[in-house]
């Protein structure tokens, strides 16, 4: 049951409140909590110089205190409330001590879900989260609802909660970090798929899966859980559903949910045809799955006509198999979002011919064997870069040896060199794609910056 936001207003007033992290989502939160009368101290690992005067001056009129620099968490003592940044583990020494002192530990997203008056659609998974979230958002908007999007994408929503009405709809993309500590779940929960990911942060795969499960473990009767029938991990969640259960599948007929019929190419929802695969503007079977998940999610709120209109007109999300340009008969695609092997495999499967693949980046301690075993025959030339380039090469070398095949592998020092190598080996009709199978943090702040740099390099090729 939704809680009255006035409860929070009364609760937070005059409370000594720590906000850990001064990133994009927490800055509006600091302003918001300050206006509600909280006594704010902002914490960040960056120094005052690294944050810049613009950020510090942003809070000059609100009496916000700062604890900055390498040992910033040593001052996390004596607070009534602590808003943690999503990537901060709840079992970190500083948070454990704060909790022992009696502090209420929470996050911007947890409080939003708790007090949001509108119906919330939550989406999580290893791959396909952003596209599925955006599809649900577009379908609800097409139907005429005032719709908000947040979480990993869009804007921080807790600071806008007073503007959200009971008639609105809210769509949230939720990461394992955001879900790890929440004790509330959205009314509609979608789990697109699950595979090894973020094992540099999570202790093991079990912890990662359990974090994802939080999207539905606090649901109640009348709520909806939507899972991928074709993914072993998500399909095993069936017995844990607390409300209604819907499934989607590209491999078999599903009565209670959505499925793809290979014979006629149609997508069905509750055994009624919605559209044909070829009606969908963005190509690839991974996008068919994203659409099926979205159809299930909005099935009680959106007409078939609105679903079809979005399918025919939605052009995709930036950095997701985004066409950049064609030069000398070679097409270049930006798939920088592909920060896991499974995501890269999905990308490779979307092309009709083997591609020149640029991969590699930050090491999340996940295995690359699936990429090598399932992707080798879809790659014409493999160009590797970043911290994982040797690790990926070793994995592919084993498969090349076992299968007695030829697959040229080129090692590059950086993205610019990788693109230049791709241009050298590409011939008329080839496809070059940046689909790293890794996070970007060894060279770039995030996948968007990496993708934009790739586009800049490609657009400057002559």
Swiss-Prot record:
Keyword Nucleotide-binding appears in the UniProt entry: yes
Main location: cytoplasm
Pfam families in alphabetical order: Mur_ligase_C, Mur_ligase_M, MurD-like_N
Pathway: Cell wall biogenesis; peptidoglycan biosynthesis
GO biological process, one term: regulation of cell shape
Catalytic activity: UDP-N-acetyl-alpha-D-muramoyl-L-alanine + D-glutamate + ATP = UDP-N-acetyl-alpha-D-muramoyl-L-alanyl-D-glutamate + ADP + phosphate + H(+)
Enzyme Commission code: 6.3.2.9
Any single Gene Ontology cellular-component annotation: cytoplasm
HAMAP family: MurD (MF_00639)
Family (UniProt): Belongs to the MurCDEF family.
UniProt xrefs under NCBIfam families: murD (TIGR01087)
Protein name: UDP-N-acetylmuramoylalanine--D-glutamate ligase
Organism from which the protein derives: Clostridium acetobutylicum (strain ATCC 824 / DSM 792 / JCM 1419 / IAM 19013 / LMG 5710 / NBRC 13948 / NRRL B-527 / VKM B-1787 / 2291 / W)
